[in-house]
């Protein structure tokens, strides 16, 4: 027992730095630090310091003990507490890293699954094209083979009847016939069964030689299409190289924004598309986040003065938003970042704020958290608050929902809302009543839960399916209340009845990539907007019931005869990319509107002779004589029209001319003598010198024109001048006395 106690005592007396040496000294220069002989040796930390041996340092040991008690011990306690805090933070940070790693792996799998799907779709599409081509060639081969076999069967019957050669029979018949001719006895000529058979075979032979099977087969032979599949190795290499840039690793700062905001607004599709938050530095040194084309400047207490003195349209807050009550001018748009930890009692967000975006905030929302002046609310990725009735006030008209974490229930969304936007990643089941019946407009991105009948309420009249939308649209998913449908680059194939017959207007946005076979667009559709489609239009893609077609900027399809069906009456054309040809516009079209940016040559016949009304915007190709057919009776020159109107450009068939704010000066003969009615509309800004309005004009309508009239601006051959309320110029003194003035 004594020996073990000695071992413990000896171990306790050992130097921590040099375990083989005993503690012998106290260093007087280092707050009585205990030392061994090695500590004080030439290479030791305390070499040259003043020391006392432990045995002769009673007073120093008392000082050491007191310092241990009063100073060192409390610091040890504090150190232990700090270490626990640090350990907790370390574990929490590591837990977040593990969680982020799981998210990263899930994202990796999901993204590459999409890439694999895309490649699979491409492979299937190529296989389908190969199969289609083979099927067409099989059909050609079958037709040729069947035709030839049928002919050969008949020919073989003729040539080899009863195992006797036809030529032998013919020779025999000729011999017999010659004998009968010598006998010169036609009346006694006997037609036996062999002769009848030869006559029949002769008929069959003539029919075979007369039919066009051989010619048809030669034609069919040329229809064979032997395709060779080629891959563009340069493009493949570019794709391979581009894969290296599809991802990046970025460090997440402590105050990072941990959610994404999707901007799916298409403009037209516009074309829209998903914008992640971007943390930026502006010219005024404040950090900002870009959301939906707004820069949300992140409030910092260290720079409060700049926020108090400057005006900000959009502000973002990390911890609290108390400064809002101090600002001389409220921002219209407010963003509460993830981690925001202030209880939003009434008035914290003052009235006057119009748009409120909320991330993963930490305090519960209550009634009056959101002021009544807010008209747009966005609940973004990670939002984790219960939305009971009244949380979203009735003043809100538009609601954007990302991947929120709490389940929506009936009354989560107030019935006063008119617009709901379901952003990419939204992951809630939409059972009946979740989207209330007051909603009129619904945008849907790449949501993760399947739509079912009654997901969309019967009050919705406009639906926009954004790029990435990936739901099967079986009959009834889009309710019959919907009248207007916008479709972007959706991922599931449209089928007959995907679009209800009640839809009257469809917009096919840029990137739309579906084959439009007959019946996909239902016969109830009257108006069709078409952007830059990825699949070729074919005859019957557009049903005959459509009366108005609008070809938007970027439209890139060849308009051969029949693509635009004969039911169309009104055609709008913007900056399309394929050349118009004769018959591109069907003869049923009576009104053509060439909008700003239209950039096609209008040679004779492009606009067919059935067109009666023509509107011209800021078109880019010069008009020439015969660009406008002689059948047109009404022309409107829209704002921005920038063409010189020399004699003959507007044909003599025109009776009525509307003129907006055009950019080129009118000259004598710009307006033909056949025009009887001229309307100078709001914004018209051209000088009207004598003769500009020809003497054949009988009615002149004047709106808010910008140029002063002068004497002889208005010819005395007019019957009536109609002056509209919007007109601000002095008109009356320039109207000839014989012309009647009518105020409208």
Curated annotation (Swiss-Prot):
Instruction: Output the InterPro entries linked to this UniProt entry.
Output: FNIP (IPR008615), FNIP_repeat (IPR052697), Znf_B-box (IPR000315)
Keyword list, A-Z: Repeat
One GO MF term: zinc ion binding
Q: Per the record's keyword annotation, is Flavoprotein included, yes or no?
A: no
Q: Where are the FNIP repeats?
A: 340-376, 383-422, 426-462, 469-508, 512-550, 555-594, 598-635, 641-678, 684-723
Q: What SUPFAM superfamilies does this protein's entry cite? A: B-box zinc-binding domain
The record's Pfam families line, in alphabetical order, gives:
FNIP (PF05725), zf-B_box (PF00643)
Q: Does the keyword Isomerase apply?
A: no
* This protein's name: FNIP repeat-containing protein cigB
Recorded source organism is Dictyostelium discoideum
């Amino acid at each position: 027992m004594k020996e073990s106690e000695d071992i413990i005592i000896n171990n306790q007396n050992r130097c921590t730095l040099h375990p083989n040496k005993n503690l012998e000294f106290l260093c007087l220069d280092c707050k009585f630090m205990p030392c061994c002989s090695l500590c004080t040796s030439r290479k030791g930390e305390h070499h040259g310091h003043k020391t006392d041996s432990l045995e002769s340092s009673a007073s120093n040991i008392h000082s050491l003990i007191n310092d241990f008690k009063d100073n060192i011990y409390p610091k040890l306690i504090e150190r232990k507490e700090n270490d626990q805090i640090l350990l907790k933070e370390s574990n929490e940070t590591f837990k977040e890293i593990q969680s982020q790693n799981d998210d990263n792996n899930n994202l990796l799998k999901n993204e590459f699954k999409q890439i694999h799907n895309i490649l699979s779709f491409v492979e299937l599409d190529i296989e389908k094209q190969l199969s289609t081509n083979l099927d067409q060639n099989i059909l050609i081969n079958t037709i040729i083979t069947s035709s030839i076999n049928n002919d050969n069967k008949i020919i073989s019957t003729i040539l080899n009847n009863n195992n006797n050669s036809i030529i032998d029979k013919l020779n025999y018949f000729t011999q017999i016939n010659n004998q009968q001719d010598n006998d010169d006895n036609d009346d006694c000529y006997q037609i036996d069964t062999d002769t009848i058979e030869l006559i029949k075979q002769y008929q069959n032979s003539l029919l075979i030689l007369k039919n066009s099977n051989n010619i048809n087969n030669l034609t069919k032979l040329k229809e064979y299409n032997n395709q060779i599949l080629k891959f563009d190795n340069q493009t493949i290499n570019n794709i391979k190289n581009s894969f290296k840039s599809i991802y990046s690793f970025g460090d997440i700062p402590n105050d990072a924004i941990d959610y994404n905001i999707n901007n799916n607004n298409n403009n037209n599709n516009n074309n829209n598309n998903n914008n992640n938050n971007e943390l930026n530095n502006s010219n005024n040194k404040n950090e900002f986040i870009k959301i939906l084309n707004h820069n949300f400047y992140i409030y910092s207490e260290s720079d409060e003065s700049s926020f108090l003195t400057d005006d900000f349209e959009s502000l973002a807050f990390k911890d609290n938003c108390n400064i809002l009550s101090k600002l001389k001018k409220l921002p219209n748009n407010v963003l509460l970042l993830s981690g925001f930890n202030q209880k939003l009692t009434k008035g914290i967000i003052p009235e006057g704020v119009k748009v409120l975006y909320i991330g993963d905030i930490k305090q519960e929302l209550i009634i009056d958290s959101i002021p009544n002046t807010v008209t747009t609310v966005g609940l973004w990725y990670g939002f984790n608050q219960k939305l009971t009735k009244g949380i979203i006030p009735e003043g809100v008209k538009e609601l954007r929902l990302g991947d929120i974490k709490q389940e929506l229930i009936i009354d989560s969304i107030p019935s006063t809302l008119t617009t709901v936007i379901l952003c990419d990643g939204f992951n809630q089941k939409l059972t009946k009543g979740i989207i209330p019946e007051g909603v009129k407009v619904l945008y849907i991105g790449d949501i993760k839960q399947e739509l079912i009948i009654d997901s969309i309420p019967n009050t919705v009249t406009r639906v926009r399916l954004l790029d990435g939308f990936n739901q099967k649209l079986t009959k009834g998913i889009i309710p019959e209340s919907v009248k207007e449908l916008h479709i972007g680059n959706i991922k599931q194939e449209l089928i007959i009845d995907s679009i209800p017959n009640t839809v009257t207007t469809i917009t096919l946005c840029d990137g739309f990539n579906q084959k439009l076979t007959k019946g996909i667009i239902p016969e109830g559709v009257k108006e069709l907007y078409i952007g830059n489609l990825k699949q070729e239009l074919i005859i019957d893609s557009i049903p005959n019931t459509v009366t108005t077609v609008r070809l938007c900027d970027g439209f890139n399809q060849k308009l051969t005869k029949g693509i635009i069906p004969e039911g169309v009456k009104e055609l709008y054309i913007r900056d399309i990319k394929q050349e118009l040809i004769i018959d591109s516009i069907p003869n049923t079209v009576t009104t053509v509107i060439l909008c700003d940016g239209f950039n096609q040559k209008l040679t004779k016949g492009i606009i067919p002779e059935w067109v009666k009304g023509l509107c011209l915007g800021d078109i880019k190709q010069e008009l020439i004589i015969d660009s406008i057919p002689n059948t047109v009776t009404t022309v409107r020159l829209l704002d921005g029209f920038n063409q010189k109107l020399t004699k003959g450009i507007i044909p003599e068939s025109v009776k009525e001319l509307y003129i907006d704010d055009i950019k080129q000066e009118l000259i004598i003969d710009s307006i033909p003598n056949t025009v009887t009615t001229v309307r100078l509309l709001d914004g018209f800004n051209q000088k009207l010198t004598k003769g500009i309005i020809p003497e054949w004009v009988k009615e002149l309508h004047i709106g808010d024109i910008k140029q002063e009239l002068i004497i002889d601006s208005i010819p005395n051959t007019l019957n009536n001048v109609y002056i509209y309320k919007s007109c601000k110029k002095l008109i009356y003194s320039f109207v000839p006395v014989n012309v009647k003035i009518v105020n409208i």
